[in-house]
Amino acid sequence: MADGQLPFPCSYPSRLRRDPFRDSPLSSRLLDDGFGMDPFPDDLTAPWPEWALPRLSSAWPGTLRSGMVPRGPTATARFGVPAEGRNPPPFPGEPWKVCVNVHSFKPEELMVKTKDGYVEVSGKHEEKQQEGGIVSKNFTKKIQLPAEVDPVTVFASLSPEGLLIIEAPQVPPYSPFGESSFNNELPQDNQEVTCS
């Protein structure tokens, strides 16, 4: 057989330069077809929450961190999602911890207290003259304590970066028959700064 000859005819379709959307008789109908579906089945003149809520609240296969999704007890049990208004339970042995950014407040302008199962953090600036006006800042943040935390053991410390770190050790679960497998000693943090 001579060089460059093949025993059978061979054509390479890749050598043909062809635009399938231009040359095909289906090209004009392919991109225009809606496949029998409306692009937006709902009325677009309605306010967005009414037409977006069904799409956002449909069942998802995993956890979805959105405030619009209703969470029932089955979703809580199935996916380990805490009920609304509750903090996720801490791991056994680890303290419950929350950080609040208070970088624009001085320690003496902050107050942390526990009341009715909540930690309440509040801060207030006195009025300051800034850029042609008087500025006064104040805030109050309430954080619900988990059931595993005793409100009496809550303490707060302020980091140099302006983060208020609120911590509390977990209450050990009840142990029947006086068998104690838990360490009753709590670690002491000597570097904490109390905010009043």
Curated annotation (Swiss-Prot):
Post-translational changes noted in the entry: Phosphorylated.
The sHSP domain, residue ranges: 74-185
Entry's Gene Ontology BP terms: cellular response to unfolded protein; positive regulation of aggrephagy
Localization annotation: Cytoplasm; Nucleus
GO MF terms held by the record: identical protein binding; protein homodimerization activity
This protein's record includes keyword Membrane: no
Alphabetical UniProt keywords: Chaperone, Cytoplasm, Methylation, Nucleus, Phosphoprotein, Stress response
PTM-bearing positions, type Phosphothreonine: T63
Tree of life domain: Eukaryota
Region (Disordered): 1-28, 176-196
GO cellular component, one term: nucleus
Compositionally biased tracts (Polar residues): 178-196
InterPro entries in alphabetical order: A-crystallin/Hsp20_dom (IPR002068), Alpha-crystallin/sHSP_animal (IPR001436), HSP20-like_chaperone (IPR008978), HSPB8 (IPR043254), HspB8_ACD (IPR042790)
Induction (free text): By heat shock.
Modified positions (Phosphoserine) in chain numbering: S24, S57
Reported function: Involved in the chaperone-assisted selective autophagy (CASA), a crucial process for protein quality control, particularly in mechanical strained cells and tissues such as muscle. Displays temperature-dependent chaperone activity.
Record note on quaternary structure: Monomer. Forms a ternary complex with BAG3 and HSPA1A. Component of the chaperone-assisted selective autophagy (CASA) complex consisting of BAG3, HSPA8/HSC70, HSPB8 and STUB1/CHIP. Interacts with HSPB1. Interacts with DNAJB6. Interacts with BAG3.
Similarity comment text for this entry: Belongs to the small heat shock protein (HSP20) family.
Record's protein name: Heat shock protein beta-8
